[in-house]
Amino acid sequence: MLDRLVRVLLLFGLSALLVACEGAAVATPPPVTLTIAGSSSMAPVLTALTDAYTRQYPNIVFDLRGGGSTLGEAAIRAGRYDLVASTLFPPDPDTGRSAPPGDEALVRTPIGIDGLAIIVHPSNDVDALSLVQLRDIFSGSVLNWQALGGDAGEVVLVSREDGSGARILFEERVMGEERVSLTAVVMPTSQDVVDYVAGNPAAIGYVSRAHTAAWIPGEAVTTTAALAEAPVKVLELEGRWPTRETVAAQQYGLTQPLYLITRGAPAGRVRQFIDFVLSPAGQAIVARYHAPIR
């Protein structure tokens, strides 16, 4: 009788414990916001990376901001933002790039390599340029498309704003001692350059390949249909297009690094996100837009 009573009490206690467990709420991790600012050239890949990361960790919220590489690096030196996306080469005395105050505290993690695509309107008959021709165009020495083998018509220049990593690269690799003509239309983001060129048959501009990845001739994923429907045309430069292969091998003339920058060694959630970006899954996402680093 006593044994039976003990068994009943044990069953009752176990049932009560199960009910209590079922009614208990599963603890949800508190939301965490990570702010990333900087390069607009990296906006497409960062959007894809953060979307993928949030699907794995729903409590992580990303606040993506622009501002450009130069302003982004200045802001993170001052302790603002969790991460900055930048396409600027690190300071190097051998190249004349001196380190601003506070730069020694920055940690640059390379995540990929970008190439600047030279774009024109699809109706433009010009398909290829040399670096010298590109410099002459943007310095204002060449004013008419007819001089380049195209139809007669004024050349409309579209450039990025001062401080943009894309503009800095363009000025260093293309312009040299020359200056971009003051007649150039200045746009704040790469997407704005694409939109302007797409709407102006006389325009020429330069943008990150991320904004033209589906329309690059010679790219493995580019289809004939995509080229036919592309809003802009990517030009050959010195006989090469900015494909992932030519960019990764540094065979294309206008390449630049892609960095995620922290003030001090990355830690905690920031470290975990960077680890994801460098993982096979993250690098596969980077490869949709740029040349991956791994």
Regions found by a protein language model. Name each.
Residues 1-4:
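N-terminal secretory signal peptides that target proteins for export/translocation
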Residues 8-19:
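Bacterial N-terminal signal peptides
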Residues 21-99, 104-294:
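Exported/periplasmic ABC-transporter solute-binding proteins
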